[in-house]
């Protein structure tokens, strides 16, 4: 159900991800575990459906918060639909780098970033290319730089660096890696995700998306305090950002993960200017042609 419950403005901007081919993994059960039809509906329509079947949406939402809640069939509803689909198959790739640890080589840290974006939209007038400079060339650059730095030191645990495919198509690359890892997933002690490192400038804080998800935040807070900085929990948890990036594929398997994001409290400009910068990106660049090299390189030049 959309609207404010999952951030209606994000749903509108994400429509670029809904056009064209819709991708999925080639599953062993040939998709039989999936619903016949999956869709989103507005809150207004949801209320109408619940009322029509004799239920109250708000009341059931409260009841569903109890862990003993059981799903049930809403009788008296039917849907007639005709969908014509052409199915084709192709391969894409996750890239994995590996540095073996010294004393605990069978334990792993994993640093991840998705390398894909949205491609080209020939229906647009003018610029048609979705460059994805911030989302997520910056994240890939961060993982590459971390790999370069880790290559200069010896670590007790092994370190995995991965650039993941098809994040924008439903976190498919990370889902595949989490389901079929070339390493023992139970021995991954920490996973770090870099998804969109905005060039907003130096900050006094660091945002943690999904605050409270793992004890890795405690280690981050300890290091930030050494720099005179602090953790700023996600100010918009209702948007569900924690569930919309690659780390969640590993979190669902029990891997402790940390998804940190740009801080809001800018050294020059404070929190107000920080939120202005994020508003500019989210509303005028995110999943659009303006998320381009000029945006990221201009900020880098200022540094």
Residue spans of the language-model regions?
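Single conserved hydrophobic/aromatic residue that forms the stacking wall/gate
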Residues: 1-7, 295, 299-303
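Second-shell loop/turn segments in exported
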Residues: 34-37, 83-86, 125-136, 204-210, ...
């Amino acid at each position: 159900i959309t609207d404010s419950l999952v951030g209606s403005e994000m749903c509108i901007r994400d429509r670029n991800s809904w056009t064209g081919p819709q991708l999925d993994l080639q599953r062993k059960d040939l998709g039989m575990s999936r619903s016949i039809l999956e869709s989103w509906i507005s809150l207004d329509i949801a209320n109408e459906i619940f009322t029509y079947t004799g239920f109250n949406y708000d009341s059931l939402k409260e009841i569903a918060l109890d862990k003993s809640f059981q799903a049930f069939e809403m009788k008296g509803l039917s849907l007639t639909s005709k969908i014509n689909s052409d199915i084709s198959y192709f391969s894409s790739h996750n890239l994995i780098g590996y540095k073996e640890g010294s004393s605990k080589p069978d334990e792993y840290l994993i640093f991840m970033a998705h390398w894909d974006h949205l491609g080209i939209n020939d229906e647009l007038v003018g610029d048609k290319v979705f460059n994805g400079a911030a989302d997520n060339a910056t994240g890939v650059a961060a993982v590459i730089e971390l790999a370069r730095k880790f290559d200069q030191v010896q670590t007790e645990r092994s370190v995995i660096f991965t650039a993941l495919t098809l994040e924008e198509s439903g976190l498919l690359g990370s889902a595949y890696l989490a389901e079929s890892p070339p390493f023992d997933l139970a021995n991954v002690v920490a996973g770090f995700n870099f998804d969109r490192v905005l060039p907003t400038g130096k900050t006094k804080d660091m945002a943690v998306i999904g605050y409270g998800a793992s004890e890795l935040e405690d280690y981050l807070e300890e290091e930030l305090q050494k720099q005179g900085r602090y953790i700023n929990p996600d100010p918009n948890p209702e948007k569900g950002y924690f569930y919309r990036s690659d780390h969640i594929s590993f979190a669902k398997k029990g891997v402790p993960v940390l998804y940190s994001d740009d801080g809001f409290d800018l050294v020059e400009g404070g929190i107000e200017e920080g939120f202005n910068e994020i508003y500019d990106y989210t509303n005028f660049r995110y999943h659009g042609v303006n998320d381009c090299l000029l945006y990221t390189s201009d900020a880098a030049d200022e540094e």
